[in-house]
């Protein structure tokens, strides 16, 4: 794909986008992939999703780049500091996926406490038919659920869990104007929790925030749920804690090196594994795509973004 004076290429796709998003971009902007772009001059917007990288190399390849539009609320795949240094603005897709991710977070809490997927495996294995007994599980009502990161999604998840009768505690950068119990560190929150739910954004500041100390504080009866970013949890420490019985189990929708999941986790019945589907509903993904298009249009027309990052 080349650009000319009549039909300049102003938008490029960096990868990781769903087919319908690629089609929408192609229809509206004739947006090719970076690999198919023979002349990068004049490209003002790069759209990226699915964890595809938008770093210095990609920015070097697009000398006129002015904006990186990310399909997703998390943007640790984008080198925001490098973009800022070059005067490139970055957007994400907040708010529109809040409900879907909060729903999944709440469902995973219910699952790890009530053993829903474990019970499904129990039936399918023939254990029930053989007269074996499924172990007793835990009530959601009265359980202390610690929400690590009380942003939009964390708040929505906490509200759902409170409706189940759970007791909500939380940690964030500072106390919020809420009735829930605040803790001043992840370790303190984990120590008070039956289930620790990770909902903090990714990025350098949260890399391996949930480490061995946090997991030890959670304790042998505690469960970890992560629907944020795989980078937030020290995966090696998590595997070790599970193998040593230092925590009771986990529910994970995200991993450090997706789509690769550690073999040690695949082999465990006390872990619920999902393929990063927190926002994977038709309605949510379409809303995210519309917000991506709104950001692209706003930047090309006015030099501004609808949902800029930081």
Predicted regions and their residues:
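Conserved beta-strand positions in the Rossmann-like core of class I SAM-dependent methyltransferases
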Residues: 169
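Short, conserved active-site loop motifs that form the nucleotide-linked donor/cofactor pocket
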Residues: 29, 88, 180, 270-271
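Rossmann-like adenosine-cofactor binding region
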Residues: 54-56, 173-264
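Phosphate-coordination loops involved in phosphoryl transfer and adenosine-cofactor binding
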Residues: 8, 65, 141-144, 221
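Phosphate-binding beta-alpha-beta segment of Rossmann-like dinucleotide-binding domains, i.e.
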Residues: 94-144, 156-159
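An N-terminal-biased, well-structured beta-alpha scaffold segment characteristic
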Residues: 1-93, 191, 211
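Glycine-rich Rossmann-fold phosphate-binding loop(s) that bind the pyrophosphate
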Residues: 150-151
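C-terminal helix-to-coil terminal segments
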Residues: 2-8, 84, 91-104, 131-136, ...
